[in-house]
């Protein structure tokens, strides 16, 4: 009797386990399908960069994702043509993105520290006023921003792309809210020991907010790297362009938006 009961329980275990984990299985399958859907454009772009121009033009005929004939001619063209100095663009993009990220981390963390920890008159009103003004779309400030860069004689130079992006009210808001979880007792103890505001910021606040600073750094770097509109306006010399508007120049150098040759070469530049 006992042996029969144990055997029956063992046989029922897989079914019971399946019922208990049905929700997790469905969620896993849904996320797997979602991941495939999100990855397909990336896979298609990378694979298409190895296609010939003729095959790219005949995509609707073959409907193939992987190339019929693999070739690296698109990468050879991107690296060899004088009209598209892609290594210079990549260098400019790294300079702009890294410089902007460092400045964003310093300015937003110190601003958040001041708004959250220091006491001064009208700080809440100032913060929420600036936060409200940030709700306007960025395109509203393009003309004043252009005039300011022109007055500083920074147009067509990398500083004109670096400095307009070093502020970010959302990042200040993010760091400030994270700072609320850091006990103020640490500040008070350091203050009793004779530490000033800058020492408290450097030795206590910064080590405590490393997780949110990592997030802000990722936002700042990817935002600067992917920026297209403002670098296209501020930079006119092809050698001074960053990578994103440079890819547009690659399309123009290929003679417009028609055909498939320039498409696969743009994809090669994008993959690089």
Briefly describe each language-model feature range.
Residues 1-5:
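N-terminal acidic, proline/glycine-rich, low-complexity intrinsically disordered segments
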Residues 6-8, 15-16, 23-272:
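A structural signal for multi-pass alpha-helical bundles of membrane permease subunits
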């Amino acid at each position: 009797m006992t042996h029969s009961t144990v055997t029956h329980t063992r046989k029922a275990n897989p079914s019971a386990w399946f019922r208990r984990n049905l929700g997790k299985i469905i969620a896993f399958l849904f996320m797997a399908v979602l991941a495939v859907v999100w990855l397909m454009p990336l896979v298609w772009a990378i694979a298409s960069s190895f296609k010939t121009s003729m095959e790219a033009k005949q995509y609707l005929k073959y409907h193939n994702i992987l190339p019929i004939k693999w070739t690296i001619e698109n990468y050879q063209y991107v690296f060899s043509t004088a009209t598209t100095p892609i290594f210079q663009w990549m260098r400019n993009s790294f300079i702009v993105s890294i410089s902007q990220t460092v400045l964003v981390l310093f300015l937003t963390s110190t601003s958040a520290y001041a708004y959250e920890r220091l006491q001064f008159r009208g700080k809440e009103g100032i913060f929420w006023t600036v936060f409200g003004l940030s709700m306007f779309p960025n395109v509203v400030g393009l003309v004043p921003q252009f005039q300011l860069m022109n007055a500083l004689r920074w147009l067509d130079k990398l500083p004109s792309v670096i400095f307009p992006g070093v502020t970010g009210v959302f990042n200040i808001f993010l760091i400030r809210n994270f700072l609320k979880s850091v006990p103020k007792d640490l500040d008070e103890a350091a203050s009793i020991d004779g530490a000033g505001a800058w020492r408290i910021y450097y030795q206590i606040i910064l080590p405590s907010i490393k997780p949110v600073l990592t997030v802000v750094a990722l936002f700042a770097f990817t935002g600067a790297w992917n920026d297209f509109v403002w670098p296209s306006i501020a930079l006119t010399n092809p050698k001074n362009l960053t990578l994103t508007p440079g890819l547009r120049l690659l399309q123009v150098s290929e003679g417009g938006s028609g055909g498939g040759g320039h498409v696969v070469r743009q994809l090669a530049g994008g993959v690089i």
